[in-house]
Amino acid sequence: MRIIFWGTPEYSISSLDIFIKSKHEVIAVVSQPDKKRSRGKKLISSPVKSFAEQESIKIYTPEKIRDNINFINELKSLSCDLFIVIAYGKILPKEILEIPKFGCWNAHASLLPRWRGAAPIQWSLMKGDEFTGVGIMKMNEGLDTGDLLLEEKIKIDNNDNLITLTEKLSILSAKLFLNATSLLEENINKNTNYQLTKQNTLGREITYARMIEKSDYKVDWGNEAIKISRKIKALYPRANTTFRGKNLKIIKIKVLSSDEINNEKYCLMSNYSKPGIILAVLENEGIIISTKTDPIILLEAKLEGKNISSKKQLIQQLKPSLGEYLSN
């Protein structure tokens, strides 16, 4: 099949790579334009554009795609069978969706219609979902509202964070894309149906994964410990707090269980009814901080201007005192 691939971040590369190595022909790649991302205002290409350049594939980086007549005519001239779209960054308008012979397919990193939108991986972790997955859908003009064609569910491990889960779903997306194109080819060869069968999603809850905002990265110590833990995993490694006026990125924590709280080694802890207070500083355990519910131990963090530090290094760097506060 003649394929045009649409994608922008590193997350998309697994899918592009698998199609390049397949029997299909990737005739062009569409990605977001170069952006100024460094202090020197140097223009930086998207990861997908850089990868496509290495593979000597024709690349388009239009500033706009809606009502872009020249770009649309160029796409039409390529006689494409299928558009493969993963994390491109813009919703494709009707005039583009109608170009390829067999439609436009998108891989979405959730169990649709749960977590439609821009940040499904973050919100599945933030809300403590037990499972997530990838769905291949035939795109329409809506926000992740197209027909679901193929889906695979995976369990979210307790140790998963944004980085690890993103990698798993990126690889799964590539596999499902290839499976879906194989199924489509089987149908075409049988002359039975030039489309895949729509999957049934009736009864599933519809939720929306809005974009992550700057304020979301702040740790609210007045929240339940489990919610704080989920946020740190979901926004890894950027969830942060403030200590003595300096930014402190929270990389990894442990929520103390009831049995651990009652253990003798934590007897230095004061009343932890006030959230965000340092309850204890234990050399072999770490810095213990109160929340709305159970206390947490700070296992890894990054003070501004420093590298990521272990619990013992943090004690040496911060020299925290009992009763000090961490602010939102």
From Swiss-Prot:
Enzyme Commission number(s) of this protein: 2.1.2.9
Signal peptide segment: none
Gene Ontology MF: a single term: methionyl-tRNA formyltransferase activity
Enzyme class, UniProt record, top EC level: transferase
Catalysed transformations (reactions): L-methionyl-tRNA(fMet) + (6R)-10-formyltetrahydrofolate = N-formyl-L-methionyl-tRNA(fMet) + (6S)-5,6,7,8-tetrahydrofolate + H(+)
Coiled-coil regions listed: none
GO cellular component, one term: cytosol
Alphabetical keyword list: Protein biosynthesis, Transferase
Function: Attaches a formyl group to the free amino group of methionyl-tRNA(fMet). The formyl group appears to play a dual role in the initiator identity of N-formylmethionyl-tRNA by promoting its recognition by IF2 and preventing the misappropriation of this tRNA by the elongation apparatus.
Family according to the record: Belongs to the Fmt family.
Protein name stated in the entry: Methionyl-tRNA formyltransferase
The species this protein was found in: Prochlorococcus marinus (strain MIT 9312)
Classification lineage: Bacteria, Bacillati, Cyanobacteriota, Cyanophyceae, Synechococcales
